[in-house]
Curated annotation (Swiss-Prot):
Pathway: Quinol/quinone metabolism; 1,4-dihydroxy-2-naphthoate biosynthesis; 1,4-dihydroxy-2-naphthoate from chorismate: step 4/7; Quinol/quinone metabolism; menaquinone biosynthesis
One Pfam family cited in the UniProt record for this chain: MenC_N
SUPFAM superfamilies from the UniProt entry: Enolase C-terminal domain-like, Enolase N-terminal domain-like
Alphabetical UniProt keywords: Lyase, Magnesium, Menaquinone biosynthesis, Metal-binding
Amino-acid positions noted as binding Mg(2+) in the UniProt annotation, renumbered to this chain: D161, E190, D213
GO molecular function, one term: O-succinylbenzoate synthase activity
EC identifiers of the protein: 4.2.1.113
UniProt entry tagged with the keyword Protein transport: no
Name by which UniProt lists this protein: o-succinylbenzoate synthase
Organism: Salmonella arizonae (strain ATCC BAA-731 / CDC346-86 / RSK2980)
Length: 320
């Protein structure tokens, strides 16, 4: 016997969370809980403002339609990426496809203070990897900060994310301030320039490896070996159903690229599922999931070790 619940939620964010030049005051989303007999599966649907093509309201309409179809024994997944992902996660839990084992390690987001980063990395097992957002300030400043971090912590590897912020000139200004001897310890720089051609040229000219992120979601993107490209960063909430995520990981691995499962600022429930997806599809690769600290609360499933309070399902607004 199939049954389902849909919940709507809104989580206050810490001050200072800015996405694409707009402040994110709350993180808005939905949960779906599917039941079939004794089995249960959850999924999160939370389009990311400025990045997702669909809005929260559009996702809600599509989710409710899909749930009603599922209750009538239709198993086709919705097209909308966030709804397809959340629905497929709920189904994967329900059927036991999504393993319980999780990789709760996370590459810490660094604000540029090497002393703070040293403390955060001290307890980190294995490779020391951190992430730095670049492109928000002057490119020269970014280059100096990255150089300082790599100089201060000799076994550090950095993942950098520019979100296509730089012109080719700005990207070169950044690289100029990073010691060539340290550049191999930049694991990758996500999407430095506005076009893929400019980003590839930057990688060839500087020896700094790059990764694709936004490009994966463009209709003309194809997986191919390219000089200077070392990784792809996959954000499942923006990608679609789990099968599509699996296909992208497989395509990347077939080319010898690193595939990184990354957060779209999901709630704790969504983050714990991403940790499981990472352990399942990209074992041994540190996922990019260090975003829970941007929120003021957790929901339904807490992240291990987090001190944030956690709401249970009864405290959420139920739509169905």
């Amino acid at each position: 016997m199939r049954s389902a619940q849909v919940y709507r939620w809104q989580i206050p964010m810490d001050a200072g969370v800015v996405l694409r030049d707009r402040r994110l005051k709350t993180r808005d989303g939905l949960y779906v809980c599917l039941r079939d007999g004794e089995r249960e599966g959850w999924g999160e649907i939370s389009p990311l403002p400025g990045f997702s093509s669909e809005t929260w309201e559009e996702a809600q309409t599509a989710l409710l339609t899909w749930v009603n179809d599922w209750l009538q024994r239709s198993d086709a997944l919705p097209e909308m990426p966030s709804v397809a992902f959340g629905a497929s996660c709920a189904l994967a839990e329900l059927t036991g496809v999504l393993p319980a084992a999780a990789d709760y390690r996370a590459a810490p987001l660094c604000t540029g203070d090497p002393d703070d980063l040293v403390l955060r990395l001290a307890d980190m097992p294995g490779e020391k990897i951190a992430k730095v957002k670049v492109g928000l300030y002057e490119a020269v400043r970014d280059g100096m900060v990255v150089n300082l971090l790599l100089e201060a912590i000799p076994d550090l590897h950095l993942r950098l994310d520019a979100n296509r912020a730089w012109t080719p000139l700005k990207a070169q200004q950044f690289a100029k301030y990073v010691n060539p001897d340290y550049r191999p310890r930049i694991a990758f720089l996500e999407e430095p320039c506005k076009t893929r051609d400019d980003s590839c040229a930057f990688a060839r000219e500087t020896g700094i490896a790059i990764a694709w992120d936004e490009s994966l979601r463009e209709p003309d993107f194809v997986f191919e070996a390219q000089e200077g490209v070392s990784a792809v960063v996959i954000k499942p909430m923006l990608t679609g159903a789990l099968d599509k995520v699996r296909a992208q990981v497989a395509a990347a691995h077939a080319l010898g690229l690193t595939a990184v499962i990354s957060s779209s600022i999901e709630s704790s429930l969504g983050l714990t599922q991403l940790a499981r997806i990472a352990a399942w599809l990209t074992p041994g690769t540190l996922p990019g999931l260090d975003t829970l600290h941007l929120m003021q609360t957790q929901q339904v499933r807490p992240w291990p070790g987090s001190a944030l309070p956690c709401l249970n399902r009864d405290e959420l607004e139920r739509l169905l």
